[in-house]
Amino acid sequence: MNKIYLIILALLSSFSLYAQGTDPQAKKILDGVNGKMKSFKGVTANFTITSVSSKGRNNGNRTGKVSIKGQKYLLKQDKVEIICDGQTIWNFDGAKTITVSSVEESGSTLSPQNLLSNFYDKDFTYRLIGTKGNFHEIEMKPTDARKNFQRVNVFVDKNSSLITKARILDKSNNTVEFTLSGINTNAALDDKLFTFNKARFPKDVEILD
C-alpha cells in the first residue's frame, strides 16, 4: 500500500516522468499538468483510496492527507506517515518501524522524485483514451515490465488542469482507485513540516536504514 501512497504523491506533484511511443494529445495534457503544478509553492489535498480485488470484492476505503512543497512531501493515513525533506525519506509503518532511504536509492522505484520529473516521457507509454464531461482520461503503461503494476489511468480536470483521480491495475488484476478532494494549490507550508523528528514517534520505534 505504501507504493500506492507514493503514486498519489507523484501524480499530485509537479508531474515529470518520461515516455516512449507517446500520444501527442496526451502529452499536451500532461505537459499542462506539469506546468501548472510547478507554478504552485505549496499543495495540500485529501485523498480516498478504494481497492477492489481481481474477483470484484471491495476491500474498503482508506482516507488521508498529503502536503507537497517542491521536492518535499508529507503523507498521513491513519498512523502511517511518510516524510521527505527532498533528500531523505522516512517511512513510518504506523506501528514500531521507520524505514529510512535516500531519494537517490529510490531512483529505480515509482517514487515521487521520479514521477516529479517527467515520467511520461521515458518511463511510460501513454495515450488519450477519451474525454467525457469535464475530464480527460489518459492510460499510462510502464515501459519496465518489472514494475508491479500493469497500467495507471489518470483523469485530468479540463478546467483546472489537475489530476483528480487515478485507477491503478496491478499484476494480479487488483484495482486501486484514488480520488483527490479539497485540493489547495496556495498552501503556505513551513519547511519544518517536512523535517523528521523522532520525538513525535513511539519511544521504542525501530529505525532501519
Show the residue positions of the predicted features:
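Beta-turn initiation residues at beta-strand->coil junctions
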Residues: 49-51, 80, 93-94, 167-170
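An acidic-aromatic
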Residues: 63-110, 176
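N-terminal leader/targeting segments and the immediate start of mature chains
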Residues: 15-57, 71, 205-209
